Amino acid sequence: MNLLAFDTSTEVMSIGVSRVVDGVPRQWLHTSAGGAQASASLIATVMDLLQQAGLTLAQLDAICFGAGPGAFTGLRTACAVAQGLAFGADVPVLPVDTLLALAEEARHAALPEVPLCRVTALLDARMDEMYAATYDFADGQWSEVQGSHLVRPEDLVVARGAQAVQVLAGNVFTVYADRLASAEQNATTRITALPTAAALLRLAPGLLAAGKAVTAAEALPLYIRDKVAKTTAERMAEKAAAHAAAAQ
């Protein structure tokens, strides 16, 4: 399966391409500063990784992006680029919850041999709040226990499951250290992690098989807080993606 994935929902921009070469799965990955810088370099880096992998946009089975929740500008940039590239190449789009990608990254990095676990994924949402969601991992599959929502650190409730391993994962443990003490009492471990393109690439085959892909026109960011206006950078990223797809 030929896949392109990227996430710009946090302060880190993560991009990846995967394909099978001579029967062996291979990945090309890139990580750099995200935030406001993502719109300036995302498309160029995507095209460079595709070239390294020997793929064109039209040869992709899907374009995956971190749909949210996360930083507004990053979410809109990722969605606009995914739409622009997919429109020109007639490729389906796979929006993936960034908190699910975070949970998968934490599990894969720190608990690869653990067959059963419950992960509460947490991203700093600023304004004294966190984005949170809880997932169970069993039999190689993820299932949602509690969907993405906003919560104050001291109000976070970690629901205990039957799993022996209960994980808190995310980027909130320094900024909200004292205020997470109650939640951490119900966790067996905590893992500092962010959503990554590698996690998106691992999740994509199962999500595609489950029919989660959409057309470019149907792709949307997942907001927990409301925001309406597009920034100039977001509009420029959308146009640049369309031009890049048309040039191939």
Regions found by a protein language model. Give the residues of each.
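DPxDG-like acidic metal-binding loop motif
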Residues: 64-92, 98
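Phosphate-handling active-site elements
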Residues: 51-59, 86-96, 113-114
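Residues at secondary-structure transition points
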Residues: 33-41, 72, 76, 80, ...
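Acyltransferase
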Residues: 190-248
